[in-house]
């Protein structure tokens, strides 16, 4: 009688990487639709630019490394990296910025480390942070949602803005950022932080048009809820586990609630933190990256909680209005340590 000895792992998941990546791309559709609805065609154009750049950059590096281009491109990881970066930057950012950021994400943050599965940091967030540090003005120049915008560019004007910086009538970014109150608009988090520094009270800030009739900023709450819908879809499909998004959101909400309770005149409310900025995008689509996140269940809870604390600290006391990207990268640094101390005991062995 012949006995076959198989090596671990003894349980297998039949889902391939390409299928998981495709599920994430599908889950991103509600968020993309919401951002396009509130901020215009620029979101779609940036996604197309980022996707093309990601595929070309990946193909070039794979060819230089003498690896199969077709098989690697078919895992959709490059497309997902480009998409996550594209939806994180302002919709009318110059074309060369998304090309530069995506190229850096693919070539430096991913392929330089050996490709998919080898990178210690989330490539899309590396690209985003490089752009934010290098071009802070352009990276914080978000359009006001169409509901409070004085001027809304059409599809052709959006293309002109991205590639030339001007509309057909000669308008520029400064003009397009003006709201119905005649004041240049920013994101709810940016407006909150800037206004506090200018000496305005929270009560005064909440009267601004960007917060009018909204829990966390006109348009932005619906964008976050749309990303939440996509996240629930990923949980339903078991493409991601619940530990990271739940621990992240609960920790962020708890920190925000405690801060708001003790200092309501200087700190943002929990709903502003949860439904503004890149909160839901980060919780379900960025932090859950299986390559750069913790691999144990306890580790995932710690990883998500750490990111939640960091986001709140950066938003409340840091120099940037939204801290999701920095929090993700800082949490990525701790993953080896978290995994070391949370790895499960080998069956049949006692702790030494």
Swiss-Prot record:
**What is the protein name stated in its UniProt record?**
Ion-translocating oxidoreductase complex subunit D
Q: Name one Pfam family in it.
A: NQR2_RnfD_RnfE
What organism is listed for this UniProt entry?
Salmonella typhimurium (strain LT2 / SGSC1412 / ATCC 700720)
Location(s), subcellular: Cell inner membrane
Q: What does this protein do?
A: Part of a membrane-bound complex that couples electron transfer with translocation of ions across the membrane. Required to maintain the reduced state of SoxR.
Which top class of enzyme applies to this chain?
Answer: translocase
As for family, the record states: Belongs to the NqrB/RnfD family.
**Cofactor list:** FMN
Coiled-coil regions listed: none
The EC code for this enzyme is 7.-.-.-
| Signal peptide (UniProt feature, chain positions) | none
Sites of the modification FMN phosphoryl threonine? Answer: 187
How this chain sits in the membrane, per its record, is: Multi-pass membrane protein
Oligomeric state and partners?
Answer: The complex is composed of six subunits: RsxA, RsxB, RsxC, RsxD, RsxE and RsxG.
Keywords of this protein's UniProt record, alphabetized?
Cell inner membrane, Cell membrane, Electron transport, Flavoprotein, FMN, Membrane, Phosphoprotein, Translocase, Transmembrane, Transmembrane helix, Transport
Q: What is its main location?
A: membrane
Task: Supply the gene name.
Answer: rsxD
Q: Where are the transmembrane segments?
A: 20-40, 42-62, 69-91, 123-143, 215-235, 242-262, 267-287, 301-321, 322-342
This entry carries the following GO cellular component terms, namely: plasma membrane
Give the NCBIfam families listed for this entry: PRK00816.1 (NF002011), rnfD (TIGR01946)
Listed under GO biological process in this entry are: electron transport chain; transmembrane transport
């Amino acid at each position: 009688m012949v006995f076959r000895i198989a090596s671990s792992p003894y349980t297998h998941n039949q889902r391939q990487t390409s299928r998981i990546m495709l599920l994430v791309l599908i889950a991103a559709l509600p968020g993309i639709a919401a951002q396009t609805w509130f901020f215009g065609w620029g979101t779609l154009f940036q996604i197309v630019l980022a996707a093309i750049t990601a595929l070309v950059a990946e193909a070039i590096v794979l060819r230089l490394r003498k690896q199969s281009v077709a098989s690697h491109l078919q895992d959709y990881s490059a497309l997902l990296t480009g998409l996550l970066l594209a939806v994180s930057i302002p919709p009318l950012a110059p074309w060369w910025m998304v090309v530069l950021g995506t190229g850096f994400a693919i070539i430096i943050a991913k392929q330089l480390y050996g490709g998919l599965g080898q990178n210690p940091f989330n490539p899309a967030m590396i690209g985003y942070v490089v752009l934010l540090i290098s071009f802070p003005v352009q990276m914080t120049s978000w359009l006001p949602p169409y509901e409070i915008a004085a001027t809304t560019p059409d599809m052709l004007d959006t293309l002109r803005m991205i590639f030339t910086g001007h509309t057909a009538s000669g308008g520029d970014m400064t003009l397009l950022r003006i709201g119905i109150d005649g004041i240049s608009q920013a994101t709810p988090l940016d407006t909150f932080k800037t206004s506090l520094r200018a000496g305005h009270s929270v009560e005064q800030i909440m009267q601004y048009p960007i917060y009018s009739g909204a829990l966390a900023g006109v348009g932005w709450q619906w964008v976050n809820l749309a990303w939440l819908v996509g996240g629930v879809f990923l949980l339903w499909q078991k493409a991601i586990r619940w530990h990271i998004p739940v621990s992240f959101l609960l920790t962020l909400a708890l920190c925000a609630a405690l801060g708001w309770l003790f200092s309501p005149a200087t700190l943002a409310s929990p709903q502003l933190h949860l439904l503004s900025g890149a909160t839901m995008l980060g919780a379900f689509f960025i932090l859950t990256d299986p390559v750069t996140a913790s691999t144990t269940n306890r580790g995932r809870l710690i990883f998500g909680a750490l990111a939640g604390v960091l986001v709140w600290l950066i938003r409340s006391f840091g120099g940037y209005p939204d801290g999701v990207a920095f929090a993700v990268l800082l949490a990525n640094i701790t993953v080896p340590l978290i995994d070391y101390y949370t790895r499960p005991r080998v069956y049949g062995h006692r702790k030494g």
